[in-house]
Amino acid sequence: MEMETIVSNTNNPTERRKAVIFPKQQQIMTVLGENIKLARKRRQLTQQLVCDRTGISRVTLRKIENGDPTVSIGHYLSVLGVLGLANDLTQVALDDELGRKLQDAKLLSDKGA
């Protein structure tokens, strides 16, 4: 599944390009959206209240709660902030097991070190 999003281009700032979103990535986004929606409801916050506190539209909040990958990460972060969950985002890629393995393999293969 491919999603279309606008990206900046030095020649044409509104040139449309397709962001490739694979099914597994979309599934992750969907789960994230559901988790955000559940967190909002557990706190008994209305969509309108979250929108008022973040400055985003209800359409954008609905997209976030549906896991729409075209919504900016900044908007996701704003909503997470209202829910008191923004710090959870700092855990992403914190424990980079694959990166460490790749780095260790390179360090072990370096000559003369």
Kindly label every feature range from the protein language model.
Residues E34-L49, D110-A113:
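Short basic helix-loop element that most often maps to the first helix and adjoining turn
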Residues Q44-R62:
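Short alpha-helical DNA-recognition segment
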Residues M1-T30, L89-A113:
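N-terminal flexible/basic segments that precede or flank functional cores
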Residues G74-Q91:
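DNA major-groove recognition helix of helix-turn-helix/homeodomain DNA-binding modules
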Residues K41, D52, G81:
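Short polybasic/polar patches that bind polyanions
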